Amino acid sequence: MTASGEDSSYVLGSHEGERDRLQRQHAIWRDDCLAAWQQAGWGAGQRLLDLGCGPGFASLDLAARVGPTGRVLAIDNASAYLEHLQAQARQSNLQQLHTLALDLNQASGVEALGDGQWDGAWCRWVAMFLNDLNPLLDLMTRALRPGGTLILHEYGQWDTFALYPRGAGLDRFVCRCIQHWRDHGGDPHVAQRLPALLEARGLRLKHCRSLMACSTSDAPKAQWLQDFLGSYPDQLAAAGLWSPGDQEELDADLSHAMGHCSVWVTPALMEMVWEKPCISSKP
């Protein structure tokens, strides 16, 4: 997802400015996506789900990966994002790419996907925004065929987001973001809960790795953090969680960072690859 706002409950919004930020975000994290898909063996002719697809930048890459003999179903609840993705798919003649409007907070829609019909499911930055994880996890588990794979990119510890030397403005921003998401029912440390929940549904963890990064101010992942710092204070201010004084202090931290040697540290993003076991036949 990306999350919730004008269309429904997208906490980060689904307006054009946020869509553009998400496009830049996907470009920065794209190599990590491609590496995960490659390791999972996703390729031509497969049937894949993109759960919480947002504007569909990953969906387009998945559609190119499976080719004309495959199928990608991109699922989201933001109509503006789905319309944008549909237009992009038509422009690129990606007839294998389809969309479905579905609220992943609700226990519905499994029937539309069918039981055991999908080779893989991709889910990035979605679980952290959901009030109830059960509908999403149940949908993924039922939709995958035996031997199918689920790839998750979710945060295990969002408050590792930091800038060194430390500044009170950025520290306050991180705390207020976490408060804002929790006020909306989200969990910015959601990956900590996923192993137990998915194991209880019979899935097996095949692979995991940390995608946490630290970098200098001019590196892409530092620029991704700077991009977020330029847009999200408005959301916090609208919620009454951010004042002009807070912004002045954050601006001072950023100005110092850009003029001196500084280290940016991302939130602790985790990659997990899960498999739905094949049903063994008894002799």
Identify the role of each PLM range.
Residues 151-219:
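Conserved catalytic/acceptor-binding region of the Class I
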Residues 119-134:
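A short SAM/SAH-binding and catalytic strip from SAM-dependent methyltransferases
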Residues 27-46, 61:
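Conserved alpha-helix/loop element of class I SAM-dependent methyltransferases that forms part
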Residues 110-120:
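A short acidic, Gly/Pro-enriched loop at the edge of an enzyme's catalytic core
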Residues 7-29:
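Class I SAM-dependent methyltransferase Rossmann-like catalytic core
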Residues 134-149:
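A short glycine-rich, Lys/Arg-flanked "PGG" loop and its adjoining helix->strand segment in the class I
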Residues 188-189, 199, 206-283:
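Conserved Class I S-adenosyl-L-methionine
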Residues 49, 55-110:
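Class I SAM-dependent methyltransferase SAM/SAH-binding core
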